[in-house]
Design a protein with these regions (language model features):
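Short, ordered "entry" segments at domain starts
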Residues: 1-136, 155-159, 163-281
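A Trp-anchored, charged/polar loop motif used as the substrate-binding/catalytic surface
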Residues: 142-153, 171
Length: 281
């Protein structure tokens, strides 16, 4: 493939050739193409932990959590990847609690894999370890102190994503109209609690390592995340509170996530698989 080097794997595929020699001297040769599965989050919103350690609020009828693949800044469902869960938990009791809190009148506001509401238990993801691996990925990390942010560009475009590490609580907010002033592309890691309001936009992965995350906004549009929102699993003596309100949207985007996994692949471990093979002789 054009651009491939000994140390630069462009297409992320390895070709292996195996030759077997029989006692009579005849040979059989097989060529296999090995690649890695595409990384995908457990759900658009991942809320791990025992039901006694999590709480959630879904305020209003204007929000949307969707596991339908969506291209960045596109219509819901405009992507081509398979859908994932709208909200994923790590234990069945938490799935029951989230579904009950949501209430039947809001089932249609959480879509994705399966029927509405798209809420179910999924394979556990170590969010804390993922955050650590990203921070330690030997790239330039934008480290910020706990604060309110309203006019920063956290990564200027989909082709120039950043890892943004806020070391404490943060309120990320934005102005009015259709011109968000707090935008970002890449990975946002918040060590404390995260609150977003107004027209905040993020393309990629948002990781919250505190005890609460609130995604809200009003008017003609609310906070929007294209990609995934991952909460750290709370310790047995701690908790995690999730609030989704207003006209906010959290939408799965394999396109936005691929920007991250391509930029920092070492942080995302996936299983190897045979993509294709053929017998050569």
């Amino acid at each position: 493939m054009s651009g491939e080097t000994a140390t630069g794997d462009v297409n992320k595929i390895v070709m292996l050739t195996s030759t077997a020699t029989r006692p009579n001297g005849s040979n059989r040769k097989v060529k296999a193409y090995i690649g890695r599965s595409t990384w995908a989050p457990p759900g658009t919103v991942y809320l791990p932990g025992a039901s006694t350690n999590i709480s959630e609020q879904f305020n209003g009828n204007g929000f949307l959590v969707s596991g339908k693949d969506t291209n960045q800044w596109g219509a819901v469902g405009s992507g081509s990847a398979s859908p994932i869960l709208g909200i994923a938990t790590s234990v069945p009791a938490s799935t029951t609690e989230v579904t009950s809190t949501l209430g039947s009148s809001k089932y249609s506001l959480v879509t994705g894999l399966g029927s509405n509401p798209s809420v179910n238990t999924a394979t556990t993801l170590d969010v804390a370890q993922l955050a650590t691996d990203l921070i330690n990925s030997n790239v330039s990390v934008l480290n910020l102190q706990a604060d309110d942010y309203s006019t920063l560009d956290f990564g200027t475009s989909a082709t120039n994503p950043k890892i943004v590490h806020i070391q404490g609580d943060s309120h990320v907010k934005c102005g009015s109209g259709n011109h968000p002033t707090a935008v970002g592309y890449g990975v946002l890691i918040v060590d404390g609690n995260l609150t977003t309001t107004g027209l905040f936009r993020w393309d990629g992965i948002v990781i919250v390592r505190g005890t609460s995350v609130s995604i809200s906004g009003g008017g003609s549009g609310g906070s929007t995340i294209w990609g995934t929102l991952l909460a750290k699993q709370p310790a047995s003596s701690s908790s995690m509170a999730l609030t989704i309100a207003g006209s906010s949207n959290v939408t799965y985007s394999s396109q936005a996530i691929k920007t991250v996994t391509d930029k920092w692949p070492s942080a995302f471990s996936t299983n190897s698989r045979i993509i294709a093979w053929n017998e050569m002789m």
